[in-house]
């Protein structure tokens, strides 16, 4: 089997570019071969050299070389701040290149809808959205159990994502990750909501298969911060069930504490990212644990350089992200006409991306009106 060739836009010097690179390389079926890794040409060349790939000063030059037959690419991964996603993804899709894009999908809902229209026109260029947690086998199992009716009719969904890294005005110190995430010109209309609230939303809706009708929200921020760092939403789901979503970046002591509890008429399913290899299924008075792992404590400083993932995640975080790349890879191989390709799982794509943007618009609008109900 020939390896798929992957290009990357952004990600140079950033922690998540490295995570994508490792996830792509985890299987022997894909490899990163080129990238426009940074807006600074000198740094772009530096990071490309570190990875041993062809470096480009900008993504347009990389696409042009692919179109001219000077570069072999099968898809592109976009790992840039939110405000750049639409322009870059549109350029790739317009050229016929499949895309794996970081979330949230875009800077504005208008951009998201334009991107969806383009994705529909380019049926031979699949589009994937990297909601990494949906790649965890236990979350995929939860989705299958719900589809099989194991918990009955869904009555209530609690979904959350707790972090503590923005409990102070870290962006004022020049910390790069904090600076762009709290800047409306780069992140969009919501900070915490766009960064991790969309994870909590898609984790819940993708797993249950439900939509969302309307929301009542309260968003707050530390004095001196331009965007929300605490994001709380009450929602009505498409079947009439209640969703309670909380996302915060000011919960001191939390790294990446995300998960959900889904209550049905016949049972309950619960999953926590910090115990990602464990899925709790409650059926009446019995509890089934599908897989149990031993939580890993914080590593001492001498061992931290051996970690390959963001703090607060388990090592299987790489495998979860790799699973999303595998789903996209399989779609591409089928479109190429390859035989005996295993079926691709239905991981998030353009529709979930648009839903996430509609959700943010409704939540921000509701919060501005003191929690008034807003349609999604």
Enumerate the language-model features and the residues they cover:
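C-terminal helix-rich "cap/oligomerization" subdomain common to oxidoreductases
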Residues: 1, 77, 120, 323-376
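Short, Asp-centered acidic motifs that coordinate Mg2+ and/or phosphate
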Residues: 34, 75, 156
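Glycine-rich, aromatic-lined ligand/substrate-binding cores of catalytic
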Residues: 194-278
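N-terminal Rossmann-like dinucleotide-binding module
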Residues: 1-51
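C-terminal glycine/acidic-rich active-site capping loop/insertion
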Residues: 237, 266-347
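Hydrophobic residues in well-ordered beta-strands that form the structural core
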Residues: 57, 101, 107, 127-129, ...
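Beta-loop-alpha module in the N-terminal Rossmann-like domain of NAD(P)-dependent dehydrogenases
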Residues: 53-118
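Predominantly a Rossmann-like dinucleotide-binding segment in NAD(P)-dependent oxidoreductases
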Residues: 13, 125-128, 133-225, 279, ...
């Amino acid at each position: 089997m020939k390896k798929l060739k992957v290009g990357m836009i952004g990600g140079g010097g950033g922690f998540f570019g490295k995570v994508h690179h490792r996830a792509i390389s985890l299987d022997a079926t894909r490899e990163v071969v080129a990238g426009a890794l940074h807006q600074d040409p000198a740094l772009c060349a530096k990071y490309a050299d570190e990875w041993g790939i062809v470096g480009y000063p900008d993504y347009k030059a990389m696409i042009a070389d692919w179109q001219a037959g000077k570069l072999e690419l099968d898809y592109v991964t976009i790992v840039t701040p939110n405000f750049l996603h639409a322009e870059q993804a549109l350029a790739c899709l317009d050229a016929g290149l499949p895309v794996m894009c970081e979330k949230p999908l875009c800077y504005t809902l208008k951009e998201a809808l334009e991107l969806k229209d383009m994705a529909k026109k380019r049926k031979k260029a699949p589009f994937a959205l990297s909601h990494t947690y949906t790649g965890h086998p236990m979350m995929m199992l939860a989705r299958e159990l719900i589809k099989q009716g194991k918990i009955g009719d869904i009555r209530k969904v609690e979904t959350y994502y707790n972090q503590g890294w923005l409990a102070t005005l870290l962006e004022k110190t020049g910390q790069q990750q904090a600076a762009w995430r709290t800047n409306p010109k780069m992140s969009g209309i919501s900070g915490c909501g766009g960064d991790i609230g969309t994870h909590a939303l898609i984790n819940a809706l993708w797993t249950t298969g439900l939509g969302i009708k309307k929301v009542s929200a309260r968003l707050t921020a530390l004095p001196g911060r331009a965007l929300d760092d605490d994001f709380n939403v009450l929602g009505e789901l498409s079947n009439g069930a209640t969703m309670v979503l909380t996302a915060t970046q000011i919960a001191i002591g939390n790294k990446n504490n995300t998960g959900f509890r889904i209550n049905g008429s016949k049972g309950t399913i619960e999953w926590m990212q910090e115990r990602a290899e464990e899925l709790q299924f409650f059926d009446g008075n019995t509890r089934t644990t599908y897989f149990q792992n031993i939580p890993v404590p914080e590593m001492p400083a001498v061992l931290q350089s051996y970690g390959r993932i963001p703090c607060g995640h388990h090592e299987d975080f790489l495998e979860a992200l790799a699973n999303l790349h595998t789903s996209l890879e399989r779609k591409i191989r089928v479109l190429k006409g390859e035989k005996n390709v295993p079926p691709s799982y239905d991981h998030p794509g353009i529709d979930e991306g648009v839903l996430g943007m509609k959700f943010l618009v409704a939540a921000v609008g509701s919060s501005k009106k003191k929690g008034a109900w807003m349609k999604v």
